[in-house]
Amino acid sequence: MLFKVLSAAVYGIDANLIDVEVDYSGVVAEKDVFHTVGLPDAAVRESRDRVRAAIKNSGYLIPPTFITINLAPADLKKEGSGFDLPIAVGILGAYGALRVDDLSQFLVVGELGLDGSLRPIPGMLPVAILAREKNIPNLILPTANAAEAAVVEGVNVYPVSSLTDVLDLLNTSVVGVIQREPYRVNTQELLGELQHFSVDFCDVRGQQTAKRALEVAAAGSHNILMIGPPGSGKTMLAKRLPSILAPLTFEEALETTKIHSVAGVLDAAAGLVTQRPFRSPHHTISDAGLIGGGIVPRPGEVSLAHNGLLFLDELPEFPRNVLEVMRQPLEDHTVTIARASMSLSFPARFMLAAAMNPCPCGYFNDKSRECMCTPPMIQRYVAKISGPLLDRIDIHIEVPAVQYKELRGGAAAEGSAQIRDRVMSAREHQRKRFKKAGEKIYANAQMTTRQIRTHCELGADSERLLERAMQQQGLTARAHDRILKVARTIADLEGAEHLTVAHLAEAIQYRTLDRSYWA
């Protein structure tokens, strides 16, 4: 007897519909003979042992026979343990243990334990989105995956804890309608909750210039590099940067959750990523760990930071090849990983924050300690970061050591909430401007050269200032565009319609590594 069950496989951050066809011959054999066809990987081939034990330990005795399992379409490689449950349901359906013979209204996914219990699998959110796109109304999945799948509207999510629970659920259905309330979450309530951060900018004493630069970076989604001696507060500042970023929209939250779900790092209890990601990989990370890869391509740190912040501490300590692979994601906001069998793309629209010492000893240009490095040593150290990569960082800012009076005295520093209000006001200016122009971008950092010409017009005095800076500092055309983008953001923070000399001068000030004493 032939029985069909609908399931899904995840490739990249998207899911494909898979037909699980089970043929139960009924001819008694000495032992079960499983044949799985349709390009299964090792995990899928091993499912026969898990499925056989799960069926037996769930109380179903099926005589040994010849069973053929086809996973269609046959030209797609099937990977992972998510086919355990649909295969078991297909076998029991073919044997006659189900009172329904049409499961076309159900999508079934899950890994089985030997005792028949269900275990969660990564990538359930793309599966739920696939069910909605294919007009499959019901999704049966492990209980631990329910929260993330339920954020997709238009799909009835039914969490189950065991194979027996699945059969009870299906046997009580009437014409594809399950007699049980589906699992639901209120996405607006999740996103509407006040964000609580364990850190705040009011913790940071002094560093007003650096705080201002971080505010500008957050307002325009600009990449930023902080340069300063050990203990000056670079890492402390970077860890507080997420607290002034604008909240995620529902579309951004859904896209971010998809990536985290596929990578297997999603908090099962949360279901939806409601805060912008903050990723801070160690400098020993490989290029595959940073941008993604593997035999089965998985998202790397740049994709896990999508719609959020990627912080690289001690930037020159990262291997040169690791830093260079970031050039394409920083420019195109996507990562494409090519393999012999497939080519997958992962989104990587993130804000880069990096920190570094100014030299090997860490005290070049420091007022309180003498630098022990020679000029060639400093040049070699800074040269670890290539010019093309530096050009893609809009803001370079020096973070000097904090003086004792600033550390111990003075009024309380401004908190993250006040800074975030200004950032969100500037973002609203940008949103309205780009919407009015019919442009599908949301931040100044995303402007193309043509859009810069449209939105960053300069007066005569500003033109002369920019020309002088370009000549004196030997700036590239890309650095020219970065300065104008940052100047536009500074104007937005002030609510100004036109760029002034003051806006441009501040933006030029944020090109520390272009100055002569760094050359």
Model feature map: region roles:
Residues 115, 312-319, 362:
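Catalytic P-loop NTPase motifs of RecA-like helicase/translocase cores
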Residues 225-267, 332:
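Walker A/P-loop
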Residues 175-216, 220, 247-302:
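P-loop NTPase nucleotide-binding/switch module
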Residues 40-48, 61-63, 70-80, 297, ...:
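Basic, amphipathic alpha-helical bundle interface domains used for macromolecular binding and assembly
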Residues 307, 313-314, 325:
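Walker B catalytic acidic pair
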